[in-house]
Amino acid sequence: MHFDQRTQSALREVGLSMDEIRAASDHVVAATEDAATDLETFFEGRETVYSDMDQAHSASEIQEHAVEYLDLYTHADDIRGYLRFDSWGVPVEAGRVITENEVIELTLGPTVQDRVRFASDPDQL
C-alpha cells in the first residue's frame, strides 16, 4: 500500500473504505510507473537534448548533452534511477513530464543536486 498509516486513517475518517483506499493507492503506483516510462521515452532515439543545468565551466544558460540512457525504477510514488551522458552520469531522485515529448524535469542527485529541465529543442527552455 502506498499510503502510510496516518494517511490511511485520515482517508477512512473522510469516509473512504479500505477497498477505495487500496484502489487509490493502485492508481498512484500506476501513474508513477507511467511517468517513469514517459521520462525514459523522452530520451529514446534522441542524439542530443538541451537543459537548463548549471554547469561550472559554462557561461551559457542552455547546455547541450549527448545522452546514452535514462534507467529508472519506481517504488510506490518514488521515481529513482540513473542518467548517463556521453562521459559522465548522475543519480535521478525524481522526475516529471512538463510538456509531453518536448520538456521534462528531473531532480538530479550528487554532483548536480538540482532540478533540471530537459528539452528536445533549446527554444523550449
Please place each PLM-identified region on the residue numbering:
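Generic hydrophobic secondary-structure signal
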Residues: 11, 16, 21, 25, ...
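Long, charge-patterned amphipathic interaction tracts in eukaryotic proteins
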Residues: 41-97
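Amphipathic alpha-helical binding modules
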Residues: 77-125
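N-terminal interaction modules that seed assembly of large macromolecular complexes
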Residues: 1-56
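Short, well-ordered helical secondary-structure segments
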Residues: 1-3, 8, 70-75, 95, ...
